[in-house]
């Protein structure tokens, strides 16, 4: 289809044959939702062709080739009519229809609570419709004197910063590392990537149209958060290479007294009216103490503190744990190691993806 800027309505000018060829690689369940929108045919949601409950990475709904052909034919007719009638989009489906479409897509009943979120994600309603309502009656002159300190410049800390900027509330971010991005700055082990679809692992108001993979790798994610911080002018509010060592609430002054340690070890302090902890849940690696470990002569490292200066080529390597990091790390290490041993406490929960 003809490319335009994100968020701008796209017009179809391609021939029937080109459209048909494009449909061969499209997700069939997604096509069915597009047909419902373009034609208003909600009977499709109650028809015989239905996707099965999806698993990670499966985008065709486990439909057979005959069913796929039927849907592609319907989609071709819908797109031809849309093109020939001037590419005028019909009204967006209402909340009840969206809910029915959601149930259809996932093969089970989706709780009502998810509908408003999904409609916002698809820009069918105003984004963040309640943003700012909590401080709407507070004069700007009062807001500008309310100081907020955010601990951490990962994805949560950056989001908090942007929201505070929008509300006219001053802030500072204290970040222990040398860059933004949190876990995507610190984690550098081989194969490091997100295990959630990339377009979900981004801010709803700041989608990226540059993801090169469904499950983006670490460098791409880090670049996304760096661009976000630069675009929104957050960097100038960040104190890098500084760690929060203590925070004490002063009831009399209604302020937080925050103790800091700089890159050279110098201790300083700051005062804030509000304190936001955005340190994340896994920002400090937990390394088990194993009996006899002191006698081990080889290299020992945690995946969260990967040492790129250590070569694993031709080595006998042991990996302890089979969590998400191991899923990504082990296949990469196996390419270099002479022998690889994996020790697990519990069976893995991921399905093979040949």
Model feature map: region roles:
Residues 17-18, 22-25, 32, 185-227, ...:
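Glycine-rich active-site loop/strand segments that organize a redox cofactor
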Residues 159-161, 165-182, 189-194, 212-214, ...:
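N-terminal cofactor/phosphate-binding cores enriched in small/glycine residues
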Residues 184, 211, 249, 256-257, ...:
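Tryptophan-centered motif/residue detector
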Residues 63-112, 117-122, 213-282:
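Feature captures the FAD/FMN-dependent oxidoreductase FAD-binding
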Residues 1-148:
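Rossmann-like nucleotide/phosphate-binding core characteristic of flavoprotein oxidoreductases
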Residues 138-145, 149-166, 170-180, 185, ...:
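Rossmann-like dinucleotide-binding core of oxidoreductases
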């Amino acid at each position: 289809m003809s490319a335009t800027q994100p968020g701008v309505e796209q017009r179809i000018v391609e021939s029937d044959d080109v459209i048909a060829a494009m449909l061969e690689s499209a997700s069939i369940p997604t096509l069915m939702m597009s047909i419902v929108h373009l034609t208003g045919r909600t009977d499709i949601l109650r028809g015989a062709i239905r996707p099965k409950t999806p698993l990670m990475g499966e985008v065709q709904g486990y439909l057979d080739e005959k069913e796929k052909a039927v849907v592609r034919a319907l989609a071709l007719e819908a797109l031809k009519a849309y093109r020939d009638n001037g590419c005028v989009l019909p009204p967006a489906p209402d909340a009840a229809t969206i809910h029915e479409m959601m149930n259809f897509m996932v093969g089970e009943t989706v709780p009502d609570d998810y509908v408003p979120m999904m409609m916002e994600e698809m820009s069918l309603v105003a984004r963040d419709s309640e943003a700012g309502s909590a401080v709407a009656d507070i004069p700007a002159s009062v807001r500008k004197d309310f100081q907020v300190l955010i601990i951490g410049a990962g994805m949560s800390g950056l989001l908090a910063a942007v929201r505070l900027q929008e509300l006219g509330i001053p802030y500072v971010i204290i970040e222990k590392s040398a860059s933004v991005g949190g876990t995507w700055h610190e984690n550098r082990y081989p194969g490091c990537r997100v295990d959630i679809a990339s377009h979900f692992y981004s801010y709803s108001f700041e989608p990226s149209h540059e993801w090169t993979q469904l499950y983006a790798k670490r460098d791409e994610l880090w670049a996304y958060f760096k661009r976000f911080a630069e675009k929104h002018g957050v960097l100038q509010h960040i104190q890098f290479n500084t760690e929060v060592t203590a925070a004490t609430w002063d009831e009399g002054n209604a302020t937080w007294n925050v103790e800091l340690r700089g890159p050279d070890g110098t201790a300083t302090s700051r005062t804030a009216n509000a304190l936001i902890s955005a340190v994340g849940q896994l920002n400090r690696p937990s390394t088990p103490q194993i009996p006899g470990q002191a006698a081990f002569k080889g290299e020992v490292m945690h995946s969260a503190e990967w040492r790129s200066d250590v070569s694993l080529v031709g080595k006998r390597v042991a990996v302890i744990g089979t969590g998400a990091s191991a899923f990504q790390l082990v296949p990469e290490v196996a390419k270099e190691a002479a022998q690889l041993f994996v020790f697990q406490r519990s069976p893995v929960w991921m399905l093979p993806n040949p």
